[in-house]
Regions:
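Cell-envelope/extracellular polymer assembly enzymes that use nucleotide-activated donors
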Residues: 16-18
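Short, well-formed alpha-helical segments that are part of the catalytic scaffolds
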Residues: 20-39
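Catalytic phosphate/metal-binding cores of nucleic-acid and nucleotide-processing enzymes, i.e., regions
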Residues: 21-24, 49, 70-74, 116
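Acidic helix N-cap motif at the loop->helix transition within catalytic regions
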Residues: 28-31, 52-61, 104-105
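A conserved acidic beta->alpha catalytic loop
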Residues: 36, 47-56, 96
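Conserved donor nucleotide-binding strand/loop of the catalytic core
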Residues: 55-86
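Catalytic-site signature of metal-activated, phosphate-bearing donor transferases
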Residues: 77-78, 84, 95, 102-263
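Short aromatic/hydrophobic "clamp" motif used to bind/position activated sugar donors
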Residues: 92
């Protein structure tokens, strides 16, 4: 009888999904985010010692709350693995504290895990706001995964690895995309750019770039974002977003080159 109960519990976990949300002072959008994921089996909020009402909101919604010490971290990635490990169920959906999950996406994920050939990871398209406009073209995030064998590196903009194949949801089905609510002003984008590129330098220790790279890599990133990733269809906002994306690459490479030059300073 005990063995039967253990097997039943194991099967139940295989058919359930835990939502994991990493937070730090995330009160602005958190209620809407939690409303959008209320149809899942478990919601885990992994908080990095917020000083606003984030924890109050999470507890009010009945979330499982765990704490990851913030220390000097300025990015979320160091807390990702801990958050995933805190989930009860075998399948985990990682949601940022400014992203909405549609009913259609939830249904798609439950349908997926009911099939024997379900991929170990699913890349989900994400539609982003910028300058008050919701972009139709998405970026992809590997956010739905099987917990067993998953590893999320602690470096900025890292992607998890999973134990098995992955697949992408079709971008043309807009109803399956995350809705990214963050509509950062250009000033805030530039402020974040400085923080994020500092972390990019740490991630790329030992990487070497040439002056050619400094020119061509940011240029290609801008052109790709504008012409091949749909920016051209979004007017001035599309051009501004593409240039900011290229600037991110330029500042990253410039800081890495600066770091190398300073190592050679013999003063």
């Amino acid at each position: 009888m005990l063995t039967d109960n253990v097997q039943k519990e194991s099967m139940d976990k295989k058919q359930k999904i835990s939502v994991v949300i990493n937070t730090y002072n995330a009160e602005r959008h958190l209620k809407r985010v939690l409303q959008s994921v209320k149809g899942f089996d478990e919601i885990v909020v992994c908080d990095m010692e917020s000083t606003d009402t984030t924890l109050d909101i999470a507890r009010e919604w009945g979330c499982k709350v765990v704490t990851f010490q913030k220390k000097n971290y300025t990015i979320v990635e160091p807390a990702r693995q801990f958050a995933i490990d805190s989930a009860t169920n075998e399948w985990v959906l990682v949601v940022d504290a400014d992203e909405l999950v549609t009913d259609e996406l939830r249904e798609e994920l439950y349908n997926s895990i009911s099939k024997a050939d379900c991929a170990a990871g699913i890349l989900i398209p994400r539609r982003n706001y910028f300058m008050g406009r919701l972009y139709d073209y998405p970026d992809y995030q590997l956010r739905f995964l099987k917990k067993e064998g998953c590893h999320w590196p602690p470096t900025i903009h890292s992607r998890p690895t999973v134990n098995g194949p992955t697949r992408r949801l079709p971008a043309k089905r807009k109803e399956l995309a995350f809705i990214h609510l963050a509509d950062d002003t250009i000033s805030l984008r530039l402020k974040k750019l400085n923080t994020y590129t500092d972390n990019e330098v740490k991630k790329r220790i030992g990487k070497r770039y040439t002056t050619f790279d400094l020119i061509m890599k940011p240029l290609w990133r801008t052109l790709r974002r504008y012409f091949f990733k749909g920016g051209i269809g979004n007017g001035a906002a599309g051009m501004i977003n593409a240039v900011l994306d290229g600037l991110y690459k330029f500042i990253t490479i410039a800081k890495i080159m600066e770091e190398e030059e300073r190592k050679n300073d013999i003063r």
